[in-house]
Amino acid sequence: MKRLVSFISILFASVALLSATEKGDTLKLMSYNLRFGELASMEQFAQYISSEQPDIVALQECDWATKRTRAPHQNGVRFVNELAYHTGMFGVYGKSINYAGGYYGIGLLSKYPILRFERVLLPNDGKTEQRSILVADIELPGGKVITFVNTHLEVKTAKMRIEQVEFIKEYLKDCPNQLFLAGDMNAIPDTKEMEMLREEWNDLTNRVFTYHSSRPEIKIDYIYTKPAENVELLCTEVKEDVKLSDHFPVISTIVSH
């Protein structure tokens, strides 16, 4: 009888494990341009992010110990480190440029361990601001590893954005993991550069405007994935009631199979 009970227990455990594997990993992904904290405090950002309980957050316009005249309340703040501390998440930072006595760049927060990360500089013509990508391998609870990429593309010229998109596609083409790409692309959906991304990447967001928060007129913030067949989109939303920045946060909840 004991052997029968043990066999049944093992059987149910196996079925449960198979079911969990079939369901995949449910992830809540966020992309948020912080506008270097000019319009809100670091504590307000931390409180908002914590309230959403995201699994991974891509952050753009992140200062590191700068001294800006436009944001004196943020002087000396190491944004990504402090957001990671106050939200209880892992955090990594990628410097794009030296600025105002510190650094300016992009960051990533993750509920799960970040196994590896790198900052990679994007093409630049020497006339525009240096941009970068932050590439992180993240281990999910079941042991699966995904690669999450955060970026903030050139704002002034479409030519540079096109070169940057081409670079990103080429740089990531041999990645063996499920890929996610999020950030402020500084381009609306129907531009050539966004069409180039959609040739290989699936857009996990809707077309609700993300900028400017005081008078929304355009969508420039996105979350993408590839290969598309491995990811199921459950819901996506632009948080139009959150006005801590000039951008709205973009959130997509997905299942990664």
Named regions from a protein language model:
Residues 31, 58-67:
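Acidic/histidine-rich, surface-exposed loop or edge segments in extracytoplasmic proteins
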Residues 9, 20-56, 90-93, 97-257:
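Active-site regions of metal-assisted phosphoester/phosphodiester hydrolases
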Residues 66-77:
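Short, flexible/disordered intra-domain loops and linkers
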Residues 7-16:
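Bacterial N-terminal signal peptides
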Residues 79-89, 109:
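Charged, glycine-enriched surface loops/patches
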Residues 1-4:
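Positively charged n-region of N-terminal signal peptides that target proteins for export
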